[in-house]
Amino acid sequence: MEQFKNFENIPFECSSSLNLISVHPSLIEFARSALKTNHVRLYQAQAWAKFTGEADFDQAFHCDFGNHTLTVPSKDECLNSITFIIYFTDVTEAHGPTHYVNRTDSNNIEGMRRFLKHREDLQHQKELRKFERSAAGPAGTLLAYGIDVFHRGTNLTEPGGYRYAMTSCFKKAGNDAIGYTSWPWHFAKPWHNIFEHATPDQLNCFGVPLPGDPFWTEETLSLAQLRYPKWDMSEYL
């Protein structure tokens, strides 16, 4: 799809700051609080650049559970996940802000059931638009929402406009019902940019065992150091 032309998984061949923004300590703590657990995993993180006229970015309202789980959202929010959208540029209404509908409003019109019964229900889309809110904001704005929250992308109309953002999705560790990215599948990407700069807590979000875990033996420590020669493993010894 054209609108996903500039949509790329981490890690990138660039600064450690951009590579690690998705596991910023504040986001990790936010996710832990929202999911009511001390153990979270990052299962999606992508940079997304949009430019005026490059594609039709206008979307219908949808929920992310469709490609984040093979089942449906749970009433227990701890069994779902939390998604962050981080703006790196100022985003006005002319720069394609995400629009969303509060869960209370969508529930009042049987949002989830109607969506599952008929995803192309135009009347449902019209009703959702009556309640839509804008996530427009200056650079640094953070939008947090769950996989059961209706939202949609909007078009950029500012001449020469652009929008730089990142998505970051967390789930409770061990929740196999939620997924998106298998990080090892992207083994050819520059993971050294993450391993050489991340804390053990940040690496744990990718599934790397914490220091003291039984996984770490003299053998695994030695082999891991060979794989990432510049990784400071002193905390794991």
Q: Which residues fall in each region the model found?
A:
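Non-heme Fe(II)-dependent double-stranded beta-helix
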Residues: M1-P73
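Secondary-structure boundary elements
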Residues: R32-R41, S74-C78, F88-H95, N107
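Double-stranded beta-helix
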Residues: C78, V91-R152
